[in-house]
Curated annotation (Swiss-Prot):
Protein name: Isoprenyl transferase 2
Organism placement in taxonomy: Bacteria, Bacillati, Actinomycetota, Actinomycetes, Mycobacteriales
Enzyme Commission identifier(s): 2.5.1.-
Subunit relationships: Homodimer.
Transport recorded as keyword: no
Pfam family for this entry, one: Prenyltransf
NCBIfam families registered for this protein in UniProt: PRK14829.1, uppS
GO (cellular component) term, any one: cytosol
Active site residues per record: 23, 71 (proton acceptor)
Length: 243
């Protein structure tokens, strides 16, 4: 990061929240004749570079799609690797993130997730809970539809118990039932790899997000690619449904 200078973008034109789909790790490795797992290893370093780039820009919130609820459909070998890998990444990187003033938050479901992964996620949250330079939401065992379903179930439970009236639920109160109620809406939805879809990521939060898709696979993604995406975001006219 030291040799890169972030673009000079006024704070009011910066995204407050970037959602990052870290896509293409497996394809990157396959194209190079490596095991798919090597692509994920490379992705760890790239994510840290993205965090540094966000800090340099002054972007306060980054959500990283680390493991989706659909990823359980992958081979047993790859799922086992990804569970251990996510656990070890948190263990390796939490102190460094803490030193940079990054607050780590976990967004996702507990069921099926390895207990060792949960322990590391909770340890990272506890260590970094008072940091204010930036928030990194690690989305592990996360799915946008699952999050909305879980919220709907909790609303139904409270309504059945007489704790909640239907008219109390609206666009302002519904997020209180999501995995991370304090998460701001996504401003910039960024996906490398050439794929142009949301893949069930932060569906509620991304209602008015600006989508930027880049052709580069995630292991080849650089801070400059992030800067380019943020510059494109800053040039757009966000109307939020108005004329």
């Amino acid at each position: 990061m030291s040799e890169l200078v972030p673009p000079n973008i006024p704070a009011e034109f910066l995204p407050r929240h970037i959602a990052l789909v870290m896509d293409g790790n497996g394809r990157w490795a396959t194209e190079k004749g490596m095991k798919r797992t090597e692509g994920h290893r490379r992705g760890e370093a790239v994510l840290l570079d993205v965090v540094d780039a966000c800090l340099a820009l002054g972007v306060p919130y980054l959500s990283a799609y680390a493991f989706s609820t659909e990823n359980w459909r992958r081979s047993t070998e790859e799922v086992r690797f990804l569970m251990g890998f996510n656990r070890d990444v948190l263990r390796r990187q939490r102190d460094g993130l803490h030193e940079k003033g990054v607050r780590v938050r976990w967004v996702g479901r507990r069921p099926r997730l390895w207990r060792s992964v949960i322990r590391e996620l909770e340890a990272a949250e506890e260590l970094t809970k008072d940091n204010t330079n930036m928030t990194l939401a690690m989305c592990v065992n996360y799915g946008g539809r699952a999050e909305i379903i879980d919220a709907a179930r909790e609303i139904a439970r409270q309504a059945a118990a007489g704790q909640l009236r239907p008219e109390q639920i609206n666009e302002k109160t519904f997020p209180d039932f999501l995995d991370e109620p304090d998460m701001p809406d996504v401003d910039l939805f960024l996906r490398p790899s050439g794929e142009k879809r949301t893949s069930n990521f932060l569906l509620w939060q991304s209602a008015y997000a600006e989508m930027v898709y880049q052709d580069k696979l995630f292991p080849d993604f650089t801070p400059q690619d992030l800067f380019d995406a943020v510059e494109e975001y800053a040039r757009r006219d966000r109307r939020f449904g108005t004329a």
